[in-house]
């Protein structure tokens, strides 16, 4: 636990000789204080129970974030020698994740950042994206990422553009994403 990311359970299923990852998932899903579940996952030893837990998470709108290891052929062979686990075909696992709305991440930093998003009481809503930056470079970086992920920017309506134009420095365009360079102190 830290000030930025709190846990109500941190557990290692180890070789899953008595308690499986799916058992821990189910236990967390029965708790009222569970906002998200993050898994560092080598293999799925009980596919039926695992899928049932994914379905339960989806029904309760509990986000699942999974860092799956053993994705490469070499990594999968190491899983066998580490715990006797068969890592399985990663494309099949990805399809399972996509079907159940699971967020698959590639490293611990991405996992922590993703889980922090769900720690907040506010829920993200579907729709288009709007953003404001104090740096044109950051604006370009986020735009490149958004385009790569097929995320659409929202179009600003005329009244929003008019309001922004009254506060922006000359030369800055009232558009989404917005470059606030030098004007950020005029907005609350």
PLM feature segments, named:
Residues 1-188:
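Catalytic-core regions of core metabolic enzymes
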């Amino acid at each position: 636990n830290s000030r930025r990311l709190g846990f109500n359970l941190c557990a290692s299923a180890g070789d899953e000789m008595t308690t499986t990852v799916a058992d821990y998932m189910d236990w967390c899903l029965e708790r009222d204080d569970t906002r998200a579940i993050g898994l560092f996952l080598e293999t799925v030893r009980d596919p039926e129970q695992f899928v049932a837990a994914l379905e339960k998470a989806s029904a309760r709108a509990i986000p699942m974030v999974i860092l799956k290891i053993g994705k490469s052929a070499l990594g999968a062979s190491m899983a066998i020698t580490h715990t006797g686990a068969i890592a399985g075909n990663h494309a099949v696992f990805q399809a399972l994740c996509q079907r159940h709305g699971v967020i698959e991440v590639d490293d611990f930093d991405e996992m922590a950042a993703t889980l922090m998003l769900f720690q907040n009481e506010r829920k993200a809503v579907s729709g288009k994206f709007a953003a404001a930056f104090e740096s044109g470079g950051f604006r370009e970086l986020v735009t490149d990422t958004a385009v790569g992920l097929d995320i659409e920017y929202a179009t600003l309506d005329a009244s929003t553009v008019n309001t922004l134009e009254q506060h922006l420095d000359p030369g800055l365009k009232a558009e989404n994403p917005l470059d606030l360079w030098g004007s950020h102190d005029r907005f609350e």
